[in-house]
């Protein structure tokens, strides 16, 4: 698990800051089952999808799935694109991920190298793991 990071809101600036963290989990579930589990967690947190990129109580995204053989799964299924299509552009995803797993790779590229190309000035750890 990463520290919790605070970042300015993404997409719609007129809202409170975002709090972001990464959890790395080992499960026997399929990616689709993980998606459903994340959606149940969001529902339990009373998430309401009223405005795209708007405020939410919880937002669970599946960034990457690695199978039992250590192979990164790639999917173009519109319901669950893997790896997450915007992850490589979002410091608020990659900085916590790097903190949780300094050896992380995304599509074969070290996450550290991707982070080095991003503006991370607004990504600030507020709660340590």
Write out the residue ranges for each language-model feature.
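Short, charge-patterned binding micro-sites
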Residues: 2-26
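Flexible, gly/pro- and Lys/Arg-enriched active-site loops
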Residues: 10-19, 32-129
């Amino acid at each position: 698990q990463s520290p919790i990071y605070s970042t300015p809101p993404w997409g719609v600036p007129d809202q409170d800051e975002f709090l972001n963290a990464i959890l790395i989990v080992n499960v026997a579930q399929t990616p689709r089952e993980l998606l459903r589990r994340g959606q149940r967690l969001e529902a339990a947190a009373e998430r309401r999808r009223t405005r795209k990129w708007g405020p939410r109580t919880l937002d669970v995204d599946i960034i990457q799935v690695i199978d039992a053989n250590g192979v990164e799964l790639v999917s173009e299924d519109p319901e669950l694109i893997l790896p997450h299509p915007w992850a490589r552009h979002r410091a608020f995803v990659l900085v916590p991920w790097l903190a949780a797993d300094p050896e992380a790779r995304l599509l074969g590229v070290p996450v550290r190298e991707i982070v080095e190309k991003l503006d991370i000035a607004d990504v600030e750890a507020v709660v340590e793991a």
